Amino acid sequence: MDVTHDMNGQKKWMQLPRNVVIGNGVINEVRDVCTDLKLIDNALVVTGKSTKGIAGEIVQDSLQDAGQNVELVISESASMKEVERIRKHAIESGTKYFLGVGSGKTIDVAKLAATDLEVPFISVPTAASHDGIVSSRASIKDGKTTTSVQANAPMAVIADTEIIANAPYRLLAAGCGDIISNCTAVLDWQLASRLQNVQFSEYAAALASMTAQILIDSADSIKPELESSVRMVVKALVSSGVAMSIAGSSRPASGSEHMFSHALDRVADEPALHGEQCGVGTILMMYLHGGDWKKISDALKLIGAPTTAKELGIEDKYILEALVLSHTIRPERYTILGTGLTPDAAEIVARKTKVIS
């Protein structure tokens, strides 16, 4: 952890990863990273069913070859019940540190369990679907409700571009949507700072905005199965995570567009991916801000991410329900949604932006 000072000169903790390793084949460097961090025994690898063979067992074998005691456990859902199950397993096995190996959900479960036990955590993503792979936040579901929970940032991030490039491209495109959503998140944060004197960090906001803009400007170069695309997106996700750590909150990367996504999770029969929904939410919220929503839509189209309800696989009526509900998701967080949209206003926004037809 690093110590910094806020605008009033008060101390606050800033958590940042010590090591970030990105590249082809870097999963084979996991034991070197652990050795560098003085993590030398009693590791718990938390992975998923599908990612166990892709990366989980590679990490386990690598650490065991280095003489470490390593256990591997399969995480089946991103719920508090699952976090508690993993936590109990870790206590019983004397775990000294965690490695979350897999998707964002698996990483969030490992991150929270490690935070609860106050032990180090290393993030080893097999997909780049959202900024949870590096942030100090975790998204946990309770039924149809998704909650963003404060956690410790990973001590290290090991992102193997070859593995991530082989994941379904839809996941990478979703990660782009999550990054581009910084555009409206920062606008919401600025608005809250002006109207409600919410603490605002110019550094965090600038980093989050720049990260999103670089991705928008490079949208036509992000393609399936290209490691160069993966490197760009992973670096952007890392930057977003760092922006949140600097801010001490998720404000630089989570605003009204994320509230819309969480509202969709509640009302839709089959929600889309988090980053996909945030991307569409960014189009809608940029319209409300009076910004260039078409630029957002065009960038998402170039990347191959959804820009309409149909492309999300969600009925128009759920888009409208989510828009009306969005302001209630985090009522303490002021955004462009204010006290909420009327059903008529929601329909105008959705039709003007062509999110619904």
From Swiss-Prot:
Name of encoding gene: egsA
Major place of residence: cytoplasm
Co-factor remark: Binds 1 zinc ion per subunit.
GO terms (BP aspect): glycerophospholipid metabolic process; phospholipid biosynthetic process
Pfam families the UniProt entry points to: Fe-ADH_2
PANTHER family the record matches: GLYCEROL DEHYDROGENASE, GLYCEROL DEHYDROGENASE 1
EC numbers, comma separated: 1.1.1.261
Names of required cofactors: Zn(2+)
The UniProt record lists the keyword Isomerase: no
UniProt GO MF annotations: glycerol-1-phosphate dehydrogenase (NAD+) activity; glycerol-1-phosphate dehydrogenase (NADP+) activity; metal ion binding
Reactions catalysed according to its record: sn-glycerol 1-phosphate + NAD(+) = dihydroxyacetone phosphate + NADH + H(+); sn-glycerol 1-phosphate + NADP(+) = dihydroxyacetone phosphate + NADPH + H(+)
Binding site for Zn(2+): D178, H258, H274
Record localization: Cytoplasm
Binding residue positions for substrate: D131, D178, H262
Gene Ontology cellular-component terms listed: cytoplasm
Pathway noted in the entry: Membrane lipid metabolism; glycerophospholipid metabolism
Function recorded in the entry: Catalyzes the NAD(P)H-dependent reduction of dihydroxyacetonephosphate (DHAP or glycerone phosphate) to glycerol 1-phosphate (G1P). The G1P thus generated is used as the glycerophosphate backbone of phospholipids in the cellular membranes of Archaea.
Swiss-Prot/TrEMBL keywords: Cytoplasm, Lipid biosynthesis, Lipid metabolism, Metal-binding, NAD, NADP, Oxidoreductase, Phospholipid biosynthesis, Phospholipid metabolism, Zinc
Full protein name: Glycerol-1-phosphate dehydrogenase [NAD(P)+]
Magnesium in keyword set: no
InterPro entries: G1P_dehydrogenase_arc, G1PDH, Glycerol_DH
NCBIfam families: PRK00843.1
